[in-house]
Amino acid sequence: MAYIFLDESGDLGFNFQKKKTSKFFIITCLFTANKRPIEKIIKKTHSELRKKYKRKSGILHCVKEKPITRQRLLQRLNEKDCFIMVIYVNKARVYTKLRDAKQALYNFVTNILLERIYNKKIISVKDGVKLIASRRETNKFLNENFKSYLSRQIENRHKIKIDIFIKTPFEEKTLQAVDFASWAIFRKYEYSDDSYYNLIKNKIVEENPLFP
């Protein structure tokens, strides 16, 4: 079984006058044939935080963690059998009509990323594929739209069965590791800070712009 885990960093806002509006939006996919070693990274990091800071179990969220926690988790991820593929979007160059259809834009970007994963044949799909995306919308209709759109695109073009799930990082621990990877890559583009990115760059097999 091949697993693809998907998360994003940045936002899809286009009012650049607002302070918190990001310049870039990225979608990160991590794929592996065995998710268990990555789950163990999360478990080990939680255990260390409990011992040192008496912190209760919860969710690791990279933006909220201390630098040492980020570094350790990313270094551990770099040692595992997994690969990362990224599409980054310079939002200033997004077509006007797509700016007004954010869900369509999100689906579009995700589909292009999945197409590249399949075309590069980085993962074996003969035993099936599970795509697990981090829950982005609480709206059930939008979640179903996302799942049906991607399933239709992949199955029609590649004749491959793909099972798509939308879960929280609490439900699917590996998504917490993808959050760290996505945050590290986002820092490189948004803030020209590649210090965290360099910890996992050996795992990144492709990193492409959309609307360059």
For the regions a protein language model found, what residue spans apply to each?
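Phosphate-ester processing/binding pockets and catalytic centers
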Residues: 1-212
